[in-house]
């Protein structure tokens, strides 16, 4: 399902209103009713669609209605329903699966399915960028609900949230031979001329060179260190078929920076397609907002250094990189002060001037994670994480 730019802007507007009003139950419920009347559907980071509504717009059971009125220990106050995600089987009268999302008066987000309540996130804003798991690790069972104190529940929920948000991702790769560190000056010219071949990619639907090396590389010198020249291929799995995009850059230091983005509301297929066809896209790293073809996409940009290891391999492991569900490799940045003045051409997001000392060289093609609906994130790293080759 693709959304137009106006539809995305309207969805993001309601989403921001809900986040800002989450501290007041009455104001939050009013915004939910407005969104329900407008037919707002928001996309979670795990790619499921959350239809914004209250309990008057679903087939609710008695236990859910009591939960909304009386609240639930260990949470204080009443609950407010703000959305539901459903799985339908044909033209049946009732959904095959229905998960209701609730907001407590103290700000925590819970999930409700078939009489079982699951803790999901400590805040409403964190809910949209955190993977969901429905297991005994975060279930609040009515039979054992009074056997723990509020502090014990708080510790349990914090451990769950930390595990979901801070599962590190390791990306490893080996540089192609012609871009590995040159030991003797005799090999410099051969490697440099080999790198003059334009790098082709049909990731964006049109074949053409991403960028060319500078003439500086064509002057061999025994003192010149071209070990900082980096060429890598990033690939993402989608429907068991790899999509490739080559990233090429010139640096003075033996390393690059990977930029990772967390999409919180967008139709990724449409957004990446727009990014490929637009030439005036703007990346504002300070406001953590990315404009793709006129569609506003909220994201959090992380930069992590790629450390050189033995035998010209590179390894990335950064605890700031959250779970595999909300991380997509979208570009590469030069780590030195050369900026873009030594880079000609480039992909659609390449800038003519350095962006805060860095330069976006290229972006991969559509990077929609291959995720099964509401599945546990265990063993999912190899399915949807981008890998370096």
Swiss-Prot record:
Principal location class: host cell
Keywords recorded for this protein, A-Z: Host cytoplasm, Host nucleus, Host-virus interaction, Modulation of host cell apoptosis by virus
GO biological process: symbiont-mediated perturbation of host apoptosis
Annotated transmembrane regions: none
Superkingdom field: Viruses
Compartments it resides in: Host cytoplasm; Host nucleus
UniProt GO cellular component terms: host cell cytoplasm; host cell nucleus
Keyword hit for Disulfide bond: no
Subunit composition and interactions: Interacts with host MDM2; this interaction leads to the stabilization of host TP53.
Family from the record: Belongs to the beta-herpesvirinae UL38 protein family.
Function: Plays a role in the inhibition of host apoptosis to facilitate efficient viral replication. Promotes stabilization and inactivation of host TP53 through interaction with host MDM2.
Protein's name in the database: Apoptosis inhibitor U19
Gene encoding the protein: U19
């Amino acid at each position: 399902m693709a959304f137009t730019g106006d539809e995305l802007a309207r969805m993001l507007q309601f989403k921001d209103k809900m986040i800002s009003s989450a501290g007041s139950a009455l104001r939050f419920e009013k915004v939910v009713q407005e969104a329900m009347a407008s037919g707002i559907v928001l996309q979670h980071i795990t790619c499921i669609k959350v239809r914004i509504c209250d309990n008057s717009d679903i087939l609710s059971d008695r236990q859910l209605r009591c939960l909304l009125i009386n609240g639930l220990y260990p949470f204080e106050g009443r609950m407010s329903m703000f959305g539901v995600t459903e799985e339908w089987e044909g033209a049946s009268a009732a959904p095959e699966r229905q998960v209701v999302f609730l907001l407590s008066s103290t700000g925590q987000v819970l999930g409700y399915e078939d009489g079982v309540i699951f803790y999901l996130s400590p805040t409403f804003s964190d809910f949209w960028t955190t993977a969901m798991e429905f297991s005994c690790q975060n279930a609040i069972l009515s039979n054992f609900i009074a056997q723990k104190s509020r502090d014990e529940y708080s510790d349990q929920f914090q451990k769950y949230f930390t595990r979901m948000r801070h599962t590190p991702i390791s990306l490893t790769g080996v540089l192609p031979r012609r871009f590995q560190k040159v030991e003797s000056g005799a090999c410099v010219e051969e490697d440099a001329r080999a790198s003059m071949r334009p790098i082709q990619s049909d990731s964006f639907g049109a074949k053409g060179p991403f960028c060319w090396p500078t003439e500086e590389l064509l002057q061999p010198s025994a003192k010149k260190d071209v070990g900082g020249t980096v060429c890598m291929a990033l690939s993402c799995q989608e429907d068991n078929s790899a999509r490739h995009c080559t990233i090429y850059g010139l640096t003075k230091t033996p390393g690059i920076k990977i930029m990772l983005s967390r999409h919180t509301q967008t139709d990724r297929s449409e957004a990446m397609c727009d990014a490929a066809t637009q030439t005036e896209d703007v990346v504002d790293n300070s406001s953590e907002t990315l404009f793709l073809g006129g569609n506003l996409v909220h994201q959090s940009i992380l930069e992590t250094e790629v450390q050189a290891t033995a035998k010209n391999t590179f390894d990335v492991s950064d605890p700031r990189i959250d779970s595999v569900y909300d991380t997509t490799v979208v570009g590469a940045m030069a780590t030195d002060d050369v900026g873009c003045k030594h880079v000609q051409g480039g992909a659609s997001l390449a800038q003519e001037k350095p962006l805060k000392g860095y330069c976006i060289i290229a972006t991969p093609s559509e990077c929609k994670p291959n995720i099964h609906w509401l599945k546990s994130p265990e063993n999912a790293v190899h399915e949807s994480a981008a890998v370096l080759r």
